[in-house]
Amino acid sequence: EIAYGEMDSLLARKIQQLMTFFGLLIPDMTNEEEQMLDEALIKTYRDFGITHDNDSVYEDKSQFPPKMKKMPVLGDLPQAPAGNPMTQRLAAIVSRFVTGSAQSFNRQTNVDLSNKYIVLDLSELKGKLLPVGMFIALDYVWDQIKADRTQRKAIFIDEIWQLIGASSTRMAAEFC
């Protein structure tokens, strides 16, 4: 595994994580759709001032830990251009998570990780939303853990098979 400090681009790592997330949402995504999504993600992060320059993710690097910029949410992705069936399909699937019944995924994470023990209860998520929610929670926790490597931490994940089980994607299993 490549540590953040050894990676060429934090943005590339984040987009790789997002491609895994979208792979859970859209398991039959074509190569062309993946390319269009990749371009849309890079543009979205660029609109937030975040580029492949790792320093661009920080609002203030003089603090410890450094203060990061506000990150985009799903609703910040550009709207699909009219007339393009591939982007229209992606937009239709993602709209459930932006304005539809799963719009709670379209916001900044508000989990306080300063307590000694933290429980992320995803028991209310059912069906296709459970692996998506588990992936998002695990991705967030992993990013927080890697932010300060001076502290020892342990993660216990109940029901992880639902993220990496038979109905999941190879990319999600590799992430875990």
Model-derived features with residue positions:
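P-loop NTPase motor domains
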Residues: E1-C176
